[in-house]
Amino acid sequence: MSYTIQAQTRTEIGKGSSRRLRHAGKVPAVIYGAGKEPVSIVFDHKDIINIQTNEDFYTSVVTIVLDGKEVGVRAQAMQRHAFKPMIEHVDFVYA
């Protein structure tokens, strides 16, 4: 099964901006690896909350549409809220 997430590049970095994004229903994330520069991104929480329940999300290549370009990535790490059904941050690596 293939998964696609629409994302935008983040311009503001830091704890305060990440909190504002989460409060607005967004998930901050980063894409790194393969000798490339890390890219900070943000996407809607609703885009990932349902697809992350499937086991193959963690092993298959996920397509992120980042500012009009498609990027193939794999989920490396995911931080979740302690008791709310909420994802706080995702680390992706280039596939």
Swiss-Prot record:
Belongs to the bacterial ribosomal protein bL25 family. Keywords: Ribonucleoprotein, Ribosomal protein, RNA-binding, rRNA-binding. It comes from the Bacteria. One of its GO terms (cellular component) is cytosolic large ribosomal subunit. The keyword rRNA-binding applies. Part of the 50S ribosomal subunit; part of the 5S rRNA/L5/L18/L25 subcomplex. Contacts the 5S rRNA. Binds to the 5S rRNA independently of L5 and L18. It comes from Shewanella sp. (strain ANA-3). CDD domains: Ribosomal_L25_TL5_CTC (cd00495). This is one of the proteins that binds to the 5S RNA in the ribosome where it forms part of the central protuberance. One of its GO terms (biological process) is translation. InterPro entries: Rbsml_bL25/Gln-tRNA_synth_N, Ribosomal_bL25/Gln-tRNA_synth, Ribosomal_bL25_long, Ribosomal_bL25_short, Ribosomal_L25_dom, Ribosomal_uL5_bac-type. This is Large ribosomal subunit protein bL25. GO terms for molecular function: 5S rRNA binding; structural constituent of ribosome. Pfam families: Ribosomal_L25p. Disulfide bonds: none annotated.
